[in-house]
Amino acid sequence: MAGLRPGAGVPPGTPWPISPGKHCVRSAISRRARLPYHAPGTPLGRFRRAPDEGSCRMAHIAFFILPAAGHVNPTLGVAEELAARGHRVTYALPEDMADRAVRVGARAVTYPLDRERFRADMVPKEESDEYTDEGEFLKVLEWLLDTTADTLPLLESAFAEDRPDVVANDPSTFWTGLLLAGKWDIPVIRSTPSYASNEHWALHPPFEPGAAQVDPALIELTARAEKLLKEHGTTSDPVAFAATVQSGPGLFYMPRYFQYAGETFDDRHHFVGPCAPRASFHGTWQRPEDGRPLVMVSLGTIYNERPGIFRACVEAFRDRPWNILLVLGGGLGAGDLGPLPENVLVRDFVPLGDVLPHTDLLVNHGGTSTAMEALAHGVPIVAMPEMPEPRATARRIAELDLGDWLLPGEVTAEKLSGIAQRVLTDDRIRKGLDRMRGEIRRAGGPAVAADVIEGLLSPAA
């Protein structure tokens, strides 16, 4: 299986909108062999080497990202840009996501992941705005520690002959990337698809269980964390170590304008906007030729098994002269939705980069990554958020006149039809979308994100 070069599949002569990079210096790295990538479909531990793509040996950047689509996808355009500049990029990912890295010109080293446990333990529950339940917090901490312990020796071995020069680390994920960066004494940059937090605004207030209520299991997990950190040569204080996750420079995949209290964040916070890749990994898409407006409905890839909501969307728009695209996200099947009118199209997944330029309205779960891509194309949004972060995004969409929102429990065909009609005809929303597109353009996207990462590289000795 050949690794794809940046630009694979792009028609000859198509210009790449890529800057040469304001920090294009060779880092002080040896000319080591390229890190083998794990070819999807081969057993764990068996690697195939990417074909030699030339003699350029600039820097090696490793991405350690929470293994969820809403965290991995926002980074792919940055990886694609870095690869196009001649850098080597490697992702640490589970097997089922490795192909995304390969398609943007990166490589992947894989680790085992129990998807059922990940979904059960790591996704905040829809009825809670924060980790106020100690049992929920304990499950998150236990998953983090278990996954760090399981992946650290595997990934340290995989990178042993080709250490990276910079680690891009998702603050939401396990600690392996941070611990390895500390061992290797290399820079770390946060890679954050969600909001920044400071003393002025935070999505999740810190979880602070009262001393009289501390579960013995929390004491045990804290001791495990101390032992793990000590074994790997860093502070044995988990609280102090966790604080480093939110310190230092960071990439945030939204414009500063969309960030709550955006003006209060210092220049360590780089709000680069959405960084969608040019490469596609969900096939191709062509808009129906009947000329009708297109409404796309998506509930993401987590809480998407909601046939009642999909049916409400169908009923809301079935008599309109519109095409309705239902994107099921791998949860339900078309048969779960009952009979559908002729203007309804059903897909499991779609390439957003192909669909959004032709979309007139997005009805979705409020996922920040998808919302940013839609807004980059000037598409208004009606959000139906389940979880804390999407609720924050839905509220921000309404505040900035980019669309509207309602809770899933409030969704009816009548309400949805009325909100959609208003969103599509409101001049304030059209003006809000125009401003947002300008803010996204000024944020700079993948080129600026790559510049920031290159700024962390050490000049050649």
Swiss-Prot record:
Keywords: Antibiotic biosynthesis, Transferase. Belongs to the UDP-glycosyltransferase family. GO terms for molecular function: hexosyltransferase activity; UDP-glycosyltransferase activity. It catalyses: dTDP-beta-L-mycarose + demethyllactenocin = demethylmacrocin + dTDP + H(+). This is Demethyllactenocin mycarosyltransferase. Residues 1-21 are annotated as: Disordered. It comes from the Bacteria. The gene is tylCV. It comes from Streptomyces fradiae (Streptomyces roseoflavus). Coiled coil: none annotated. One of its GO terms (biological process) is antibiotic biosynthetic process. Involved in the biosynthesis of mycarose which is a 6-deoxyhexose sugar required during production of the macrolide antibiotic tylosin. Catalyzes the transfer of L-mycarosyl from dTDP-beta-L-mycarose to demethyllactenocin to yield demethylmacrocin. Disruption phenotype: Cells lacking this gene accumulate desmycosin (tylosin B). Its EC number is 2.4.1.318.
